[in-house]
Amino acid sequence: MANTVSAKKMTRKIAKRTAINRSRRSRMRTFMRKVEEAIASGDAANALAALRSAEPEIMRASQKGIVHKNTASRKVSRLAARVKALQA
């Protein structure tokens, strides 16, 4: 348990930041799940639309430090490849 005033404040700040990060991570995963569901249903147009909305969310999460830049790029790349294969 935090004893000093500054330690207590840091505990509050960490809790606040954790909640924000959890929300952003959840939002990113929701957008990715929409792409996955569109791919699973076989709807190429819907999958492409979902990918176009998911890509900025994933990259925004990387800019905010939720995921590493390379991880975000890898996720976008793999989703894009699956959507492209669906269109072919």
From Swiss-Prot:
| A Pfam family assignment | Ribosomal_S20p
Q: Gene3D superfamilies, from UniProt?
A: Ribosomal protein S20
Q: Name one GO molecular function term.
A: small ribosomal subunit rRNA binding
GO CC terms in record: cytosol; small ribosomal subunit
Q: List the disulfide bonds.
A: none
Which controlled-vocabulary keywords does the entry list? Ribonucleoprotein, Ribosomal protein, RNA-binding, rRNA-binding
User: Sorted alphabetically, which InterPro entries does this protein's record hold?
Assistant: Ribosomal_bS20, Ribosomal_bS20_sf
**GO BP terms in the entry:** translation
PANTHER family, per database record: 30S RIBOSOMAL PROTEIN S20, SMALL RIBOSOMAL SUBUNIT PROTEIN BS20C
Q: What does this protein do?
A: Binds directly to 16S ribosomal RNA.
State the family named in the UniProt similarity comment for this chain: Belongs to the bacterial ribosomal protein bS20 family.
| Name of this protein | Small ribosomal subunit protein bS20
Q: Which organism is it from?
A: Methylobacterium nodulans (strain LMG 21967 / CNCM I-2342 / ORS 2060)
